[in-house]
């Protein structure tokens, strides 16, 4: 009988210990969520920095924004994915980082634009995983040239042909 009562107290003690662990994990989670959202916002801001620098044809700012994008994107950890999704996302991240690094060292604005076309296509594929909450993003396309880019507004500012076709484009998707 004593062993039975002792076992009950042990089980109650274990349940209480688990409840305390859960409470402590719940207290940490909001801070981690906040940090993750801040990193997502920074990644999108860095991407938009590349795009906007290309719109004004500033090769140096484009290179700096690409370096920041690469560094911050490299810190991002994908969450809640199946093994197959994780493999695809990890492969995409590697490719996107390599493209951003190439933009940062590209010798000309035209080369940066060519690389940005590839980066934008790959980035849109995983945009759901890096998009901050409550931030609408738009995939835009220049129908004459077939190039796409991501923007945080519906207004068209074509980063690939700003001199001749600044407003050439349309929103083709929204997330």
Please describe what each predicted stretch is:
Residues 1-25:
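Bacterial Sec-dependent N-terminal signal peptides
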Residues 25-175:
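Mature extracytoplasmic or organellar-lumen-exposed domains after removal of signal/transit peptides
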């Amino acid at each position: 009988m004593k062993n039975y009562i002792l076992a009950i107290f042990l089980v109650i003690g274990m349940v209480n210990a688990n409840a305390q662990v859960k409470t402590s994990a719940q207290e940490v989670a909001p801070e981690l969520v906040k940090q993750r959202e801040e990193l997502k916002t920074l990644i999108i801001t860095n991407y938009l920095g590349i795009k906007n620098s290309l719109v004004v044809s500033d090769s140096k700012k484009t290179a700096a924004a690409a370096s920041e994008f690469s560094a911050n994107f490299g810190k991002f950890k994908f969450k809640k994915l199946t093994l197959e999704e994780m493999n695809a996302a990890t492969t995409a991240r590697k490719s996107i980082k390599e493209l951003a690094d190439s933009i940062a060292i590209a010798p000309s604005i035209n080369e940066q634009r060519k690389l940005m076309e590839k980066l934008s296509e790959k980035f849109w594929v995983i945009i759901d995983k890096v998009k901050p909450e409550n931030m609408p993003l738009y995939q835009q396309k220049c129908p004459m040239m077939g190039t796409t880019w991501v923007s945080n507004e519906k207004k068209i500012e074509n980063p690939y042909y700003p001199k001749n076709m600044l407003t050439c484009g349309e929103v083709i998707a929204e997330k």
